[in-house]
């Protein structure tokens, strides 16, 4: 993904997603190859890969910021994949709503909800 500053794994603050595809994302005059978490504290590199099984450890950063996230949009890559029931219960316990969709839809929805001032986070798997 061309243009902007190189992203080193964490960018503080709220950022809108300017572009996605080509295996990465562009936001806040930065670009990142790979998956990302968009959280109240900032944007973080995320080790999730399209098609790999979901695990609680992938969402530890989200759990740590639960007070600032009422809704988590999960961009599952190209195809939507369900979360295991135990993981869904963990989100319920923390009162974080979930919406799973493909990454393109999640990125667009995230931008709209951030612009509205909502307490939203996004976990976005990169797509080509």
Predicted regions and their residues:
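Short active-site-adjacent helix-start/loop capping segments
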Residues: 45-47, 80-83, 109
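Beta-hairpin (beta-strand-turn-beta-strand) motif
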Residues: 74-79, 103-104, 125-127
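Mid-chain, well-packed structural core segment of small domains
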Residues: 62-99
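Conserved phosphate-binding catalytic cores of ATP/NTP-utilizing and phosphoryl-transfer enzymes
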Residues: 109-115
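Short Gly/charged-rich anion-binding patches and loops
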Residues: 20, 86-88, 105-108
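A short glycine-rich beta-strand->turn/loop micro-motif centered on a GG-aromatic cluster
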Residues: 97-107
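Non-catalytic interface/targeting segments
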Residues: 1-56, 115-122, 126-127
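Short, charged beta->alpha transition segments
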Residues: 56-63, 109
């Amino acid at each position: 993904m061309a243009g902007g500053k190189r992203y080193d794994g964490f960018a503080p603050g709220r950022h809108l997603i300017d572009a996605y595809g080509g295996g990465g994302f562009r936001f806040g005059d930065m670009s990142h190859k790979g998956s990302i978490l968009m959280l109240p504290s900032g944007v973080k590199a995320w080790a999730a890969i399209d098609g790999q099984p979901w695990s609680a450890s992938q969402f530890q950063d989200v759990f740590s910021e639960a007070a600032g996230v009422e809704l988590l949009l999960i961009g599952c890559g190209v195809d939507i994949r369900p979360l295991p029931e135990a993981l869904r219960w963990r989100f319920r316990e923390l009162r974080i709503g979930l919406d799973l969709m493909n990454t393109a839809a999640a990125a667009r929805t995230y931008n709209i909800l951030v612009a509205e001032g909502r307490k939203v986070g996004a976990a976005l798997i990169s797509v080509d």
